[in-house]
């Protein structure tokens, strides 16, 4: 689950990374649900990444998480083309952005 406890650790890890990549893929296949803190932190990461010119791609978002993110207006922030059904599609999307 992507909820309060893991959201803080995730945010800390993202801020400690060195070089800023052109694309960052976040694999969501093992995230059965997401709470409001998780949405807040994921949104903050996307906003920060936009400022740094890094594209965020989500991979493997299940229906429950998809519905929550959609209701929160998250897809307008990220762009539907950056929500991929699996890692292979996400990697192809990333490749198209860096070529």
Q: What are the functions of these language-model segments?
A:
Residues 1-99:
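Structured cytosolic domains appended to multi-pass membrane proteins
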């Amino acid at each position: 689950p992507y909820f309060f406890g893991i959201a803080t650790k995730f945010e800390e890890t993202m801020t400690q990374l060195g070089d800023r990549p052109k694309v960052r893929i976040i694999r969501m296949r093992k995230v059965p649900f997401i709470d409001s803190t998780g949405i807040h932190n994921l949104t903050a990461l996307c906003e920060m990444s936009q400022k740094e010119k890094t594209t965020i791609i989500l991979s493997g978002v299940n229906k429950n998480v998809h519905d929550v993110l959609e209701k929160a207006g998250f897809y307008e922030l990220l762009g539907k083309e950056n929500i991929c059904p699996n890692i292979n599609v996400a990697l192809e999307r990333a490749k198209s952005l860096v070529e």
